[in-house]
């Protein structure tokens, strides 16, 4: 219920809001309530998984004349000034093609998600320190809160629906890197998020372990290998 109430606050912050429902059965009463509050709804019925939902939402927004698209999870809580501050950051990228995400504050570990940078033969994880500001270059950002420009979507194409669950966002970011599309974190904007469930065991200092279901882990490993 709280998620629905928050969703209904978004039309006051953004000119076009669409919710993509991946539930197997459409809730017509809920759809009518959202429509009355200014939220368009797409009943996707889990076609293509989360990637299919992303594609359906982005293509709906393209049809409405939008040139920047923001993606959120159902539990994302969007601050009042989020869109203005993120668009200000997007304007500083220096390229009409971009993927720009916020600084993600992981509630499960009470700290910011680090920057992930991948090169041909190496990878690096860099903490985001409290005093960081502006746009930070990286290779991978998570989908929640990310701004994608129309020019970037046209250059990169649709999200891969065969990935279905995990690494949909990572694959898209790696595709962006291969095509020279800038991937940035806007350190001036923070978005709280929960990433998996923290393990009760600490195997190594400051290594974050996410506990997930066995099925989710199988999908994750398969998609990571395919990446």
Task: Identify the role of each PLM range.
Residues 20-30, 46, 76-77:
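A conserved acidic beta->alpha catalytic loop
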Residues 66-77:
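Short beta-strand-to-loop acidic/aromatic patch adjacent to the donor-nucleotide binding site
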Residues 100-113:
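Short beta-strand-to-loop element that shapes/binds the nucleotide-sugar donor at the catalytic cleft/hinge
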Residues 128-148:
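A recurrent flexible, glycine/aromatic-enriched loop bordering the glycosyltransferase active site
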Residues 146, 152, 156-157, 162-189:
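A short, conserved alpha-helix in the catalytic core of glycosyltransferases
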Residues 182-227:
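Active-site-adjacent helix/loop segment of glycosyltransferases
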């Amino acid at each position: 219920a709280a998620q629905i109430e928050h969703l209904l606050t978004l039309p006051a912050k953004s000119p076009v809001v669409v919710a993509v429902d991946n539930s197997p059965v459409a809730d017509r009463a809920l759809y009518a309530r959202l429509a009355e509050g200014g939220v368009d709804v797409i009943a996707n019925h889990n076609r293509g998984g989360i990637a299919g939902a992303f594609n359906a939402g982005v293509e709906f927004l393209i049809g409405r004349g939008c040139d920047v698209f923001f993606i959120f999870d159902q539990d994302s809580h969007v601050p009042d000034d989020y869109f203005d501050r993120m668009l200000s950051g997007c304007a500083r990228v220096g390229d009409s093609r971009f993927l720009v995400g916020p600084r993600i504050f992981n509630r499960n570990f009470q700290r910011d998600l680090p920057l992930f940078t991948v090169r041909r033969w190496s990878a690096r994880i860099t903490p985001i320190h409290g005093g960081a500001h502006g746009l930070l270059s990286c290779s991978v950002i998570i989908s929640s809160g990310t701004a994608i420009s129309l020019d970037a979507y046209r250059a990169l194409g649709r999200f891969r629906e065969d990935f279905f669950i995990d690494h949909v966002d990572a694959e898209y970011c790696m595709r962006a890197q291969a095509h020279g599309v800038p991937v940035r974190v806007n350190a001036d904007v923070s978005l709280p998020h929960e990433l998996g469930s923290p393990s009760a065991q600490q195997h190594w200092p400051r290594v974050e372990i996410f506990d997930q279901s066995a099925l989710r882990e199988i999908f994750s490993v398969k998609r990571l290998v395919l990446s």
